[in-house]
């Protein structure tokens, strides 16, 4: 009941205070759910600066929202609040549309934690504009070069493999390959959250990446998603280290190094593989990884001498000297 009254209060206050942009903010987007993991996500690309903060909204265990065209950002937080209060995506959409005097220029996609979808394209949305819903997803687009964009996005999402982030990227790429925004491209964003809330939002946000200004934003977004995958593995390795599970830590770190080139982490990934191998008493095996880190930045050699104070390398001056010597080979 508390959530319901909160949602109604936000609804009455938020829409009354809305100031909408005079130009359309977003062009094409997708909201979706992974039925296997419960993950929820939204991805968008636009010929508009820094599209992510206004368009993409998602909350673990609740749903995801994309609000675009002549955007009213209130659809994001209010839509999530209504779904959290027990409304389906369609019920949340209907409640918001019914109170919006500017609904004819809105375009909104929503999905709830059960995979129910809702989408709305206003009658005055700039063509080509349209949308398509499918099982566990909705795609929506406006200001398109061709009227085939949303069908291309839907087909790409339905036919692609991989996790939710990958499928969202594939949908964006399909839209761009179909011609995309008639104005061009400038920014993109992806937000993927876990299916169940942990109580720690920074843990629940699996991917939260934004390209504010770039000549090929979707391509850059894909690069950052892959880089984030590597850092997720680095984080996993760190967790294993804290549990003194060195073999599992090494495995996670090595997987991180396989996902991206060393230069993309500035040597971070191979360096920590090396450190963990030393902790696991695999000294000789650590040397190639230390060398890889040093090739990216010579500062890694200085860090070797600082780690023993944090308990991350043995207090063994002879060993530390040997590692640094091997790094520089």
Language model region names:
Residues 255-278:
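Short, charge-rich amphipathic alpha-helical segments embedded
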Residues 3-13:
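Sec-dependent N-terminal signal peptides
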Residues 267-272, 299-327:
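TPR/TPR-like alpha-solenoid helical repeat scaffolds
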Residues 17-183, 190, 212-248, 258-261, ...:
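Alpha/propeptide regions of enzymes that mature by internal proteolysis
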